[in-house]
Amino acid sequence: MFGKGGLGGLMKQAQQMQERMQKMQDEIAQLEVTGESGAGLVKITLNGAHNCRRIEIDPSLMEEDKEMLEDLIAAAFNDAVRRAEEMQKEKMASVTAGMSLPPGFKMPF
């Protein structure tokens, strides 16, 4: 029913995949991505766990409109999140290669 290796082989493969995924998640958490807005005037750096590590604001913006600065910060944050998710997807692709995952399924769980 389970082919060569039987159920034991299937369980071993599942355990190995789980270990590889955990290792990759740990590696991803250590990586950093930077999102930008306003042609680099606002930069936000997140780690792979989406925790904010750093916010950089060009001094010229301190004299500008408060609402514009808030919009630029939000845009930079959203850009950083998008980049972090892309990076995670690329890194996890090697672990999930050959698995049929449903559309929109995000890794790690």
Curated annotation (Swiss-Prot):
Keywords attached to this Swiss-Prot or TrEMBL record, sorted alphabetically, are: Cytoplasm, DNA-binding
Coiled-coil regions listed: none
| The UniProt record lists the keyword Cytoplasm | yes
- Write out the GO MF terms: DNA binding
A GO cellular-component term linked to this record: cytosol
Q: Where in the cell is it found?
A: Cytoplasm, Nucleoid
Q: Which Pfam families match?
A: YbaB_DNA_bd (PF02575)
Indicate the principal place this protein occupies in or around the cell: cytoplasm
Can you tell which superkingdom this protein's organism belongs to? Answer: Bacteria
Identify the stretch(es) annotated as Disordered: 1-23
Q: Which family does it belong to?
A: Belongs to the YbaB/EbfC family.
Q: Which HAMAP family match?
A: DNA_YbaB_EbfC
Q: What is the recorded function of this protein according to its Swiss-Prot or TrEMBL entry?
A: Binds to DNA and alters its conformation. May be involved in regulation of gene expression, nucleoid organization and DNA protection.
Q: Subunit details for this protein? A: Homodimer.
Q: What is this protein called?
A: Nucleoid-associated protein Asuc_0997
- Species this chain originates from: Actinobacillus succinogenes (strain ATCC 55618 / DSM 22257 / CCUG 43843 / 130Z)
Q: What lineage does the source organism belong to?
A: Bacteria, Pseudomonadati, Pseudomonadota, Gammaproteobacteria, Pasteurellales
